[in-house]
C-alpha cells in the first residue's frame, strides 16, 4: 500500500471512516488520541446503536424487553390478587370458635398421660438443679 492509499476503518457502533494513510501518520506524530471523523462513508448501512438486537428502533420497542420486561413481571406479581392458599384464616374464625376439646379431655384426662420412659432421670436432674437456683 502506498502512502496515499485509503482504507476504510470501523470506529464505533455508527461510524465508518475513510482515512488516508498520510493523515493517520500525522495523527500519530502529534500524539492525537481522538482523530476527527473526516469522511462518513454512506455506502454502509446504519449499524445498530444501543440495544444491539433492536437496531435504531423506537424507545417503546426497547422497553418491551430486558430490564423493563423483568420489572413489569415483578410489579404484576406484587399487584396480583392473592390466591386461596395465601389468604389468612379470617374466613375460618367461626368454625374455629366452635371447636372444643371437652370430649377428648373426658376420654383421656391430662393426668393420666402415658407413662414416661425416663426411668427416674428427671427426678435426679431436678434434685441436682434445685440447689443451684
Swiss-Prot record:
Cellular compartments per GO CC: host cell cytoplasm; host cell nucleolus
Domain of life, source organism: Viruses
Region (RNA-binding (RRE)): 13-27
Protein's cellular compartments: Host nucleus, Host nucleolus; Host cytoplasm
Biased segments, Basic residues type: 51-64
Nuclear localization signal and RNA-binding (RRE), short sequence motif: residues: 59-82
Keywords linked to the UniProt accession: Host cytoplasm, Host nucleus, mRNA transport, RNA-binding, Transport
MF terms (GO), sorted A to Z: RNA binding
Positions of short motif Nuclear export signal: 89-102
Region described as Disordered: spans on this chain: 42-65, 103-133
GO biological process: mRNA transport
Domain note: The RNA-binding motif binds to the RRE present in incompletely spliced viral pre-mRNAs. This region also contains the NLS which mediates nuclear localization. These overlapping functions prevent Rev bound to RRE from undesirable return to the nucleus. When Rev binds the RRE, the NLS becomes masked while the NES remains accessible.
SUBUNIT field: Homomultimer; when bound to the RRE. Multimeric assembly is essential for activity.
Function: Escorts unspliced or incompletely spliced viral pre-mRNAs (late transcripts) out of the nucleus of infected cells. These pre-mRNAs carry a recognition sequence called Rev responsive element (RRE) located in the env gene, that is not present in fully spliced viral mRNAs (early transcripts). This function is essential since most viral proteins are translated from unspliced or partially spliced pre-mRNAs which cannot exit the nucleus by the pathway used by fully processed cellular mRNAs.
Descriptive protein name: Protein Rev
Organism taxonomic ancestry: Viruses, Riboviria, Pararnavirae, Artverviricota, Revtraviricetes
Gene name in the database record: rev
Amino acid at each position: 500500500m502506498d502512502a496515499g492509499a485509503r482504507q476504510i476503518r470501523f470506529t464505533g457502533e455508527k461510524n465508518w471512516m475513510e482515512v488516508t494513510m498520510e493523515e493517520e501518520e500525522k495523527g500519530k506524530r502529534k500524539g492525537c488520541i481522538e482523530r476527527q471523523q473526516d469522511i462518513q462513508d454512506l455506502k454502509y448501512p446504519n449499524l445498530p446503536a444501543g440495544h444491539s438486537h433492536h437496531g435504531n428502533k423506537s424507545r417503546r420497542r426497547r422497553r418491551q424487553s430486558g430490564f423493563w420486561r423483568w420489572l413489569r413481571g415483578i410489579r404484576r406479581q406484587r399487584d396480583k390478587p392473592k390466591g386461596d392458599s395465601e389468604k389468612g384464616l379470617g374466613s375460618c374464625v367461626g368454625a374455629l370458635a366452635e371447636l372444643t376439646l371437652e370430649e377428648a379431655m373426658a376420654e383421656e384426662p391430662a393426668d393420666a398421660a402415658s407413662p414416661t420412659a425416663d426411668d427416674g432421670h428427671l427426678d435426679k436432674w431436678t434434685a441436682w438443679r434445685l440447689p443451684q437456683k
